[in-house]
Structures are given as C-alpha cells and as structure tokens.
Amino acid sequence: MAKKVTGVVKLQLPAGKATPAPPVGPALGGYGINIMAFVKEYNEKTASQAGSVVPVEVTVYSDRSFTITLKTPPAADLLRKVAGIEKGSGTPNRKIAGTITKKQLRQVAEQKMADLNAFDIEAAEKIIAGTARSMGIKIVD
C-alpha cells in the first residue's frame, strides 16, 4: 500500500547552502520531519549548482518520511545570469536593464522546458521572452 501524503511544501533555497534556520525550519517543522536530514539531502543534490536558487518540492508522508523533487532555477535567475545583470529594471517599459540574443533565449527556454506548460520549444521561448520583457531585458537578433 502507498504511503499517505500529509503535505507538500514548496521552497526556493540557495543551492548547496540550505540551513535549518528560517525559511526551512518553520516551513518543515510543522510536518514533524527531520529538518537536518532534509538539509543534508538537499545540499548533496544541489552541490553542483552552487550560486543559483533551486526550487524544491518536499512531499511529506504520514510516517514522517519525505521525498525531494528538484525543479529548474527560476526563469528570472537564468535570464539575469545570461544577461550579466544584478537585477531587473524597476521600470521595464522605460529603462532597459540588459540585452540577450535569441540564441541565449532559446538556451534558457530549453533549460526550463521541463517545468513549463509548453508543448514545444517555440511556446517555451514565448513564455521566457515575456519574463525577460517584464524584467526590462531586451531580446536582439
């Protein structure tokens, strides 16, 4: 028989640097799971992606065990790295924060494809282009 799920917790944590302090402790403590075990497993799985934020979905079961599902980094983080900027524009339609090429846009879309509601790469590119536009990142040919 399958284990009964008691909750699903979604967190965005720095890769390889999770600690039991907030936000991890309070978010997972209510479910009664071993927070140190989660932190250790998360840090091992994300050690290779150091420097980026990695979203994680923690499924908690009735016997206080859990499974970790890692997602791809947020599109905004990927776009910031590709554009080489610290943060997006505060006024996206007036001030351009940076530029990326269509080739770079396609690379980000391919990386995010698994987590997007898109059936083909062109649809994924449109989703990522919208995120870039809202951040003040201009897409050039």
From Swiss-Prot:
Keywords: Methylation, Ribonucleoprotein, Ribosomal protein, RNA-binding, rRNA-binding. It comes from the Bacteria. GO terms for biological process: translation. One or more lysine residues are methylated. PROSITE patterns: RIBOSOMAL_L11 (PS00359). Pfam families: Ribosomal_L11, Ribosomal_L11_N. GO terms for molecular function: large ribosomal subunit rRNA binding; structural constituent of ribosome. InterPro entries: Ribosomal_uL11 (IPR000911), Ribosomal_uL11_bac-typ (IPR006519), Ribosomal_uL11_C (IPR020783), Ribosomal_uL11_C_sf (IPR036769), Ribosomal_uL11_CS (IPR020785), Ribosomal_uL11_N (IPR020784), Ribosomal_uL11_N_sf (IPR036796). The keyword RNA-binding applies. Belongs to the universal ribosomal protein uL11 family. Part of the ribosomal stalk of the 50S ribosomal subunit. Interacts with L10 and the large rRNA to form the base of the stalk. L10 forms an elongated spine to which L12 dimers bind in a sequential fashion forming a multimeric L10(L12)X complex. This is Large ribosomal subunit protein uL11. The lineage of its organism: Bacteria, Bacillati, Chloroflexota, Chloroflexia, Chloroflexales. The gene is rplK.
